[in-house]
Amino acid sequence: MYAAYYERCKRPDSPAMRDANPVVVLVPGVGRITFTTDKITARLADEFCGNAINVMRGAEAIGDYIAPDEQEAFDIEYWLLEEAKLLRMPAPGPMVGRIAQVTGGAGGIGTATAARLMAEGACVVLADRDAAAVQEVCNGFAKRFGRDVVRSVACDVTDEAQVAAAFEACAREFCGLDILVANAGIASSAPIRETSVALWRKNYDVLAEGYFLTARAAWPLFERMKDQGGTSVVFIGSKNAVAAAAGASAYASAKAAANHLARCLALECAPRGIRVNVVNPDAVIKGSKIWNGDWRKEGAGTHGIYAREELEAHYRNRSKLGRDVLPKDIAEAAYWLASDASAKSTGNMIYVDAGNAQAFTR
């Protein structure tokens, strides 16, 4: 229909036909739905349509509303000055139209990863069990990137119902899911004789079962989006998932379980075009919440270190490159694995640890 309208009304100097798909769809009993390349433009289209309806209603209050004829409507739509303005607009970012969910969204790695995705045009749902903290992060991102592209949801990844609700919120707000960054986690350290069953279960509940619940809940949305391409899962693992760590058996083995889950999912889901990869960081202290928990006295204390600056120096000196590992470094790797730049990579692991010989590929 739109193509026929264009052919009837075009002039010799008319711009080429634009997207023939409808922008506004009116569904009786449901409402007005707008479709565009990004959430901001969709909202603006909805507002313009609403204002147009209000003008029509206002006109009907004093007489009959007379719509412009087809040719006049075409000349407005394909006005050459409007076309010149459109041609001068910057190219859309590589993540425009993509929808991501980031668990552990209030922490250092989660916020850095979300920021990296939104900077390239993605819409992001931040999920974190700390509702107040994740809402604060969301508010900051709304000011930075715009209120249309970010939402937050309270979610404990060990709670099956909360995980399901988080993905329902993602579908409701943005109509799908293209990228999952499974990042929610904890850190613990204790020798085996002091590792309680409760501590062991807590690590496996969050780091193994939590990743399983998150990935499983995402799958129905991924299945609906697979024809669009670019569907990607990124697990945030750990150097300790592949390198034995004395005094951290619960944490390290749970991380290893999550990494092997990623391998299994990569194998299972490749025929569906869903990619699954892992980023293994090490010693991310700056911007991390782990310094505020028991890990400070359990882990850092075993090295005789009780000041953050001393611990950062300890890990920096331990690395082969002698450099700090920051949340933004992990975010860069996660972004690459989520993007089309890695479209032919699945089942892989990237180490962002400033060089740790224990984790070298053997």
Protein language model features and the residues they cover:
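Substrate-binding pocket helix/loop in short-chain dehydrogenase/reductase
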Residues: 191-192, 196-204, 315
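Active-site helix of classical SDR
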Residues: 215, 254, 262
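Residue(s) in the substrate-gating loop at a strand-loop-helix junction
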Residues: 238
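Short C-terminal tail/terminal secondary-structure segment
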Residues: 334, 346-362
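Active-site loop immediately N-terminal to the catalytic Tyr-X3-Lys motif
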Residues: 193, 243-249, 271, 322, ...
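Short, small/polar-rich loop/turn modules that mediate ligand/substrate recognition or access, typified
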Residues: 181, 270, 275, 345-347
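Alpha-helical segment proximal to the catalytic Tyr-Lys
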Residues: 220, 267-268, 343
